[in-house]
């Protein structure tokens, strides 16, 4: 009994909770990094054309772009015995596990189900790729919100996001390293099968272990029946009445979609500038990262992905893919180092200098990749992009925290030009029941709108509440509505949408550009050009109060 009590106290310690949460961060990044490395060559090998291959890679980001703001709002208002975040994390994790099963076994499943397996194999492979990309990237939004829920103190917030960035980099290192190993000749091959089956079997084992760690996270519990918002007389429904709750949820879901569109489109100018800068920076970096292994395999090693197994051309391509995986591994290793020293860099040089330096370093690295035919130079350039990767993982989110800590300065309330109708004529309903703004959560946190003032944050992080009350306003003219107080979870979802959107344009257009140019070097040229555009928009970001007057925000 004493031993159990000691273990329970140990697991509920702040550092233990931080490690348990970020184990899932590690697992997600391992799966995504291995997928980014291995999926494009796999699609090319089964006969998907270059332009269609890039479009397949855009399926997950497009779906995520639509669902991330909605999921962020739904998570803020969810109530259940397992908390607000973990049910969404577990549901998305199931999708990832399904994709890890489908991708290496698409041909085997297609052969079992139909006599002509080729079309079904392609369909199952595309389904698996889209599911992995969508669930893996969307899962980061409730995970970031869970960190913000549990680590609200400025010092703890800074530590939480530093560990978060560190675990992303560490997961990327392992995820890029695993495809670089020739598993066909390893000791695991007789037990796990081919290269693909060995790789994805290991990914499944790693991810299951990381998801199991979230069972020990001490998230807030349910508070009981939700109180209706002020001024509302919501009908009371028994908790066991599932059809009633389902009808209510679907009714509010239909009304919430246009409201979310309004919230995202009418975001404050400070956040809009940060969004555009992050979008351009991520677009450049993801164009580089998504197609780097294909560029090395075809461009540097002169391999052919559709060549027969055992031929010289195919062997060169496979060697190039493994060398490309090594370059991306070094990218994550450099990112890991910078995530450890990022706080010191910001304290020494300031957020503006570090952010601009990281964005400016990228086109230099991408340009060197375009111009050089040396494997060593290209690999070193890929490693240099880890600085940009680390900065984009940390600084935009901590700037968003700064905006919310001083929301009266950086996030002014917006009101329409015309006068509104009386409150009696409007009906407001919550999407899902949740605690009132300012009401304490069971773990002692205070919701958005609480009266407590937080102390000044350290260099990287400002604490803020992570719950946002997104209410659907029915029966009131659009111009009379007041944009509700924004919570950080919605704005984190918007920043995550920039990351997802940054993969859509490259996925849609890069394949056609490469086919027109007849050279995979077009991948790197496009990345360098987007990096130059990102430098301009990075100079327009609001880093402190002096920028508000400078940019007339």
From Swiss-Prot:
One of its GO terms (biological process) is sucrose transport. Belongs to the glycoside-pentoside-hexuronide (GPH) cation symporter transporter (TC 2.A.2) family. It comes from Macaca fascicularis (Crab-eating macaque). The gene is SLC45A3. This is Solute carrier family 45 member 3. InterPro entries: MFS (IPR011701), MFS_trans_sf (IPR036259). It is found in: Membrane. Keywords: Membrane, Symport, Transmembrane, Transmembrane helix, Transport. It catalyses: sucrose(out) + H(+)(out) = sucrose(in) + H(+)(in). The chain crosses the membrane at residues 19-39, 52-72, 88-108, 120-140, 161-181, 198-218, 275-295, 323-343, 353-373, 382-402, 522-542. The keyword Transmembrane helix applies. Coiled coil: none annotated. One of its GO terms (molecular function) is sucrose:proton symporter activity. Proton-associated sucrose transporter. May be able to transport also glucose and fructose. It is a multi-pass membrane protein. One of its GO terms (cellular component) is membrane.
């Amino acid at each position: 009994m004493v031993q159990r009590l000691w273990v329970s106290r140990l697991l509920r310690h702040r550092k233990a909770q931080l490690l348990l949460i970020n184990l899932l961060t590690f697992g997600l990044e391992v799966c995504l990094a291995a997928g980014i490395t291995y999926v494009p060559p796999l699609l090319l090998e089964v006969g998907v054309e270059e332009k269609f291959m890039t479009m397949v890679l855009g399926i997950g980001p497009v779906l995520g772009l639509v669902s991330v703001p909605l999921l962020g709002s739904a998570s803020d208002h969810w109530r259940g015995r397992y908390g607000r975040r973990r049910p969404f994390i577990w549901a998305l994790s199931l999708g990832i596990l399904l994709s890890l099963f489908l991708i290496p076994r698409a041909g085997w499943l297609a052969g079992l189900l139909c006599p002509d397996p080729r079309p079904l194999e392609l369909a199952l492979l595309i389904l698996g790729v889209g599911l992995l990309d969508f669930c893996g990237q969307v899962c980061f939004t409730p995970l970031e919100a869970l960190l913000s829920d549990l680590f609200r103190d400025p010092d703890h917030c800074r530590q939480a996001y530093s560990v978060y960035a560190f675990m992303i980099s560490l997961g990327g290192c392992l995820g890029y390293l695993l495809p670089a190993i020739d598993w066909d000749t390893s000791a695991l091959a007789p037990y796990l099968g081919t290269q693909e089956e060995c790789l994805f079997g290991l990914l499944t084992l790693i991810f299951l272990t990381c998801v199991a760690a979230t069972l020990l996270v001490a998230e807030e519990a349910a508070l009981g029946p939700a109180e209706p918002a002020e001024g509302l007389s919501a009908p009371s429904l028994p908790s066991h009445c599932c059809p009633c709750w389902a009808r209510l949820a679907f009714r509010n879901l239909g009304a919430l979609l246009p409201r979310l569109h309004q919230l995202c489109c009418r975001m404050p100018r400070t956040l809009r500038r940060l969004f555009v800068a992050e979008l351009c920076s991520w677009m450049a970096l993801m164009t580089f990262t998504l197609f780097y292994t294909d560029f090395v395999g075809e461009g540097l090693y002169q391999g052919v992905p559709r060549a027969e197994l055992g031929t010289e051309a195919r062997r060169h391509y496979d060697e190039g893919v493994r060398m490309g995986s090594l370059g991306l591994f070094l990218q994550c290793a450099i990112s890991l180092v910078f995530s450890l020293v990022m706080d010191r860099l910001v304290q020494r040089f300031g957020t503006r200098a570090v952010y601009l330096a990281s964005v400016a370093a990228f086109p230099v690295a991408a340009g060197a990749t375009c111009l050089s035919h040396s494997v060593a130079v290209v690999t070193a350039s890929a490693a240099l992009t880890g600085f940009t990767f680390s900065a984009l993982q940390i600084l935009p989110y901590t700037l968003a925290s700064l905006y919310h800590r001083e929301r009266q300065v950086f996030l002014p309330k917006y009101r329409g030009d015309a006068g509104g109708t009386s409150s009696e004529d409007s009906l407001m309903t919550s999407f899902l029941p949740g605690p009132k703004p300012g009401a304490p959560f069971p773990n002692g946190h205070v919701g958005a709108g609480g009266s407590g003032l937080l102390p000044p944050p350290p260099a990287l992080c400002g604490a803020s509440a992570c719950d946002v009350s997104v209410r659907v306003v029915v029966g009131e003219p659009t111009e009379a509505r007041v944009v509700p107080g924004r919570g950080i979870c919605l704005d984190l979802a918007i920043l995550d949408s920039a990351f997802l959107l940054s993969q859509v344009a490259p996925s849609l257009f890069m394949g056609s550009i490469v086919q027109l140019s007849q050279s995979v070097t077009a991948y790197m040229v496009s990345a360098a050009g987007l990096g130059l555009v990102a430098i301009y928009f990075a100079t327009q970001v609001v880093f402190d109060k002096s920028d508000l007057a400078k940019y007339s925000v």
